[in-house]
C-alpha cells in the first residue's frame, strides 16, 4: 500500500479559533471562502518524505483488519481501546510474532474522520471545545460532566478521543515527564520498587525518539536546553521535539521569569520540573505534523507484524468470564450487530479514565451496592471503581501584545492565508506551533497561600513536586475576532485536593458514563486557583513584560481585584486540563480502594488487566501522556516476561 493512502489534498476543516472559542459562523464562513486550500501533507524534502509514511503494512493491509461479525474468532490478547496505551500495548505484544492481538476501537481513522484538524499542529483547537456550533462526533465521545459547583454550575465538555490514537490525536501534544519524587511516591503507594524513577526511565526512553532543538533552526533568544541523558539515541516510535516556529511572546516570558528568579530547567524530561523551559511536543520535526500512537506504534506494528487485527467502529459492551472468574473475551457491537470476540490469554482494557471503569461496572466489577441497584450481577466487589478521579483546570488573564500571536489567525484577513501558504510551501509559520511552547513549574512561595494550605501541600507531596505550572498561551481564553495580537499568561494547579467520580446509570456502554470531576470542590483548590491567577498577573506586570504588553488587561479586566471577584471569573471561564486519571487506581492488596495491583491486574478476577491513565494511583505533576506511553511499555514488557 502506498504511503499516500491517507494523504489529504484540500483543507478539511475551518481554521483554528481562539481557545475556548464560541465560534462565530458568519466570520468562519467568510474567512474560509477566501482561503487557499491546505495542500498535500508532505514536504519536498526526501528525508522528511521517508519519515512520513502513515498506513503501510507487511503483506496486505486488509489482512490487519478483523472479520466483523464472524463467530468463533479468538486471539491471545484482546485490547479494548486503540488509544495511547492500547496501541503501544498492541505493538509490543505482537512484536515477537508468537502472540495474536486484536485491538477493538469504537472510532475509526482520524485522518479520514477529522481531516487536517488532527494533522496540522495549530489546528488542534478546531474541535478542542464544544460550543454547539462546530462538532465532530466521529472522533470524540463528546462526554459532558455533571454541573460543576466549583465552575459556576457549568456542564463541561470533556475531550476524549474516539479514534485510533485516542487522545493523542485530540490533545495539545505536550510531552514531558513527572518529577522524580512523583514516581518514587507511586512506588511507595503500591509497594513496588519497579515504579521508582530510575526504573521508569528505560520505559520512557523506549517509547520516544527525541529530536533536539538543533534539528530545526531556532532564534538566538529562544535557546532550549535539554538533559540528553533523559533520552537514548535509538529511542522509540513516538517522535518528540520542538515546534518549528517559536512563539514570539515566549522569549519575553523567559526573560521575565529569569528576572523573577525561576531557574532554567533542562526540558522537563529528566525528572526535574521546577524551573522554566521551552517544552517538547509530540510533533514530527521533519514533517511538522502531529505525532500520535497511531502514526507511531500502530504504523510500526502494521509494517513489521502480521499477527495484529484491528476492529474499528466497534463498541465493547461487556467483558465475558467463565465460571472460574477468568476473562474469556468481550461482547461487542458493530453498527447494531452484537457478537463476541474471544481471548485465549488476557483481556486488556485501555479505554481511558471514563470508559475503563464503565466497562468494569457493566461487567460486574465495582461497588456492590451500586451494581445491585442497576441489576448487574456482582463478580468482584471493588468499591474503588470509578472513584478517585483527579484532574485540574487551566486559568489566567489575557492582555494585548506588540508581537505576532496566534490570535491573529481569526479576524485578520492577511494572517491566516499567509500562514496556510507558509505551511503548504515550506512547512513553517504559525501553523507549525500549537500555541503553547513555553512552560514553568513552581512550588508555592511564602505568603502565596494560607499557612494551613501550604502545610497540607508539603505533607501530601514530595519536595520536588510543583504546586503550579505556568503556560505561555499564545492566544485568548475568550475569542476576540478583531485580528489583534493577544496573550494569556495561564496556570494550572499541580496539587489539587478535589476528587471526582465516574459512575453509571445504565448497564449499556452505548450510554455515556456519569462524570463528576468535582473541580475546585475543595476550598484549598479555590485558594490555589486565586493564588495562581495573581501570580500570572504578577508575571504580566513585570518590568520585562511591560515592554511587550500593548495595553490594559482585557480579560477579565483590572476591575477584578478581590479574591471573590477573581474566583468568580475563574469559575466562569476556566477550562478542563483534560488530564484525568485515577478511576481504577493501582494499590496494595490491603488498600480498600485499589482496583488493580502493581502489574495492572484487576483484583478479584483473572485474565483481565487495565493499562491506561485510569490506573494511576494519583495525578502525576503535569501532562500524563508521556507517563501513559511508558506505563504501557512497562506492563507489556512484564507480560512478555511472564508476569
From Swiss-Prot:
Top enzyme class: lyase
Gene Ontology biological-process annotations: aflatoxin biosynthetic process
Protein name: Versicolorin B synthase
Pfam family, one: GMC_oxred_C
Entry annotated with the keyword Nuclease: no
The record's account of how the chain is modified after translation: N-glycosylated.
EC number: 4.2.1.143, 4.2.1.142
Keyword check for Lyase: yes
Role noted for this protein: Dual cyclase; part of the gene cluster that mediates the biosynthesis of aflatoxins, a group of polyketide-derived furanocoumarins, and part of the most toxic and carcinogenic compounds among the known mycotoxins. The four major aflatoxins produced by A.parasiticus are aflatoxin B1 (AFB1), aflatoxin B2 (AFB2), aflatoxin G1 (AFG1) and aflatoxin G2 (AFG2).
Pathways per UniProt: Mycotoxin biosynthesis; aflatoxin biosynthesis
Residues carrying covalently attached carbohydrate according to the record: 116, 221, 507
One GO location term (cellular component): cytosol
Coiled-coil ranges from the UniProt annotation: none
Amino acid at each position: 500500500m502506498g504511503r499516500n493512502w491517507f494523504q489529504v489534498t484540500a483543507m478539511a476543516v475551518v481554521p483554528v479559533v481562539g481557545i475556548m472559542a464560541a465560534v462565530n459562523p458568519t466570520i468562519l464562513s467568510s474567512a474560509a471562502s477566501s482561503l487557499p486550500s491546505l495542500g498535500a501533507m508532505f514536504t519536498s524534502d526526501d528525508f522528511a518524505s521517508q519519515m512520513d509514511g502513515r498506513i503501510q503494512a507487511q503483506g496486505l493491509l486488509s489482512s490487519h483488519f478483523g472479520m466483523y461479525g464472524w463467530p468463533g474468532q479468538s486471539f491471545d490478547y484482546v485490547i479494548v481501546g486503540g488509544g495511547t496505551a492500547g496501541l503501544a500495548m498492541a505493538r509490543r505484544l505482537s512484536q515477537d510474532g508468537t502472540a495474536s492481538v486484536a485491538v477493538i476501537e469504537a472510532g475509526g481513522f482520524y485522518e479520514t474522520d477529522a481531516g487536517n484538524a488532527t494533522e496540522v499542529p495549530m489546528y488542534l483547537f478546531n474541535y478542542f471545545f464544544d460550543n454547539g456550533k462546530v462538532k465532530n462526533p466521529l472522533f470524540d465521545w463528546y462526554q459532558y460532566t455533571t454541573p460543576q459547583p466549583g465552575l459556576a454550575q457549568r456542564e463541561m465538555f470533556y475531550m476524549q478521543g474516539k479514534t485510533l490514537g485516542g487522545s493523542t490525536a485530540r490533545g495539545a501534544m505536550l510531552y514531558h515527564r513527572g518529577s522524580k519524587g512523583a514516581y518514587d511516591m507511586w512506588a511507595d503507594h503500591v509497594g513496588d520498587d519497579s515504579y521508582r524513577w530510575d526504573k521508569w526511565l528505560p520505559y520512557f526512553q523506549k517509547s520516544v525518539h527525541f529530536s533536539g532543538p538543533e534539528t530545526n533552526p531556532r532564534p538566538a533568544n529562544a535557546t532550549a536546553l535539554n538533559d540528553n541523558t533523559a533520552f537514548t539515541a535509538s529511542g522509540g516510535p513516538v517522535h518528540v521535539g520542538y515546534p518549528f516556529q517559536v512563539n514570539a511572546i515566549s522569549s519575553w516570558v523567559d526573560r521575565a521569569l529569569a528576572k523573577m528568579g525561576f531557574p532554567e530547567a533542562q526540558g522537563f524530561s529528566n525528572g526535574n520540573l521546577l524551573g522554566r523551559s521551552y517544552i517538547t511536543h509530540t510533533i514530527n520535526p521533519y514533517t511538522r505534523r502531529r505525532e500520535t500512537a497511531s502514526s507511531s506504534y500502530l504504523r510500526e506494528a502494521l509494517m513489521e507484524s502480521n499477527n495484529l487485527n484491528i476492529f474499528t467502529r466497534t463498541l465493547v459492551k461487556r467483558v465475558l468470564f467463565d465460571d472460574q472468574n477468568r476473562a474469556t473475551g468481550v461482547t461487542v457491537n458493530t453498527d447494531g450487530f452484537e457478537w463476541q470476540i474471544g481471548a485465549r490469554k488476557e483481556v486488556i482494557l485501555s479505554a481511558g479514565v471514563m470508559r475503563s471503569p464503565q466497562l468494569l461496572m457493566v461487567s460486574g466489577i465495582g461497588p456492590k451496592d451500586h451494581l445491585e441497584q442497576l441489576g448487574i450481577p456482582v463478580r468482584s466487589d471493588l468499591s474503588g471503581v470509578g472513584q478517585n478521579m483527579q484532574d485540574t483546570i487551566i486559568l489566567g488573564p489575557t492582555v494585548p501584545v506588540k508581537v505576532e500571536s496566534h490570535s491573529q489567525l481569526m479576524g485578520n484577513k492577511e494572517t491566516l492565508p499567509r500562514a496556510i501558504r507558509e505551511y503548504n510551501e515550506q512547512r513553517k509559520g504559525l501553523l507549525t506551533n500549537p500555541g503553547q511552547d513555553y512552560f514553568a513549574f513552581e512550588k508555592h512561595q511564602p505568603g502565596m497561600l494560607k499557612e494551613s494550605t501550604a502545610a497540607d501541600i508539603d505533607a501530601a507531596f514530595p519536595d520536588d513536586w510543583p504546586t503550579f505550572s505556568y503556560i505561555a498561551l499564545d492566544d485568548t481564553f475568550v475569542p476576540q475576532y478583531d485580528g489583534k495580537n493577544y496573550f494569556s499568561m495561564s496556570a494550572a494547579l499541580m496539587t489539587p485536593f478535589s476528587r471526582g467520580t465516574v459512575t453509571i446509570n445504565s448497564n449499556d456502554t452505548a450510554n455515556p458514563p456519569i462524570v463528576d470531576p468535582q473541580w475546585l470542590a475543595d476550598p484549598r483548590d479555590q485558594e490555589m486557583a486565586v493564588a495562581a491567577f495573581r501570580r500570572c498577573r504578577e508575571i504580566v506586570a513585570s518590568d520585562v513584560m511591560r515592554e511587550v504588553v500593548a495595553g490594559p488587561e482585557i480579560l477579565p479586566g483590572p476591575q477584578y481585584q478581590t479574591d471573590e471577584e477573581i474566583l468568580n471569573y475563574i469559575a466562569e471561564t476556566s477550562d478542563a486540563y483534560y488530564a484525568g486519571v485515577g478511576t481504577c487506581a493501582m494499590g496494595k492488596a490491603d488498600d480498600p480502594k485499589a482496583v488493580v495491583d502493581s502489574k495492572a491486574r484487576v483484583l478479584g478476577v483473572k485474565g483481565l488487566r487495565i493499562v491506561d491513565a485510569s490506573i494511576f494511583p494519583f495525578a502525576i505533576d503535569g501532562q500524563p501522556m508521556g507517563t501513559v506511553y511508558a506505563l504501557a511499555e512497562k506492563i507489556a514488557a512484564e507480560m512478555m516476561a511472564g508476569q
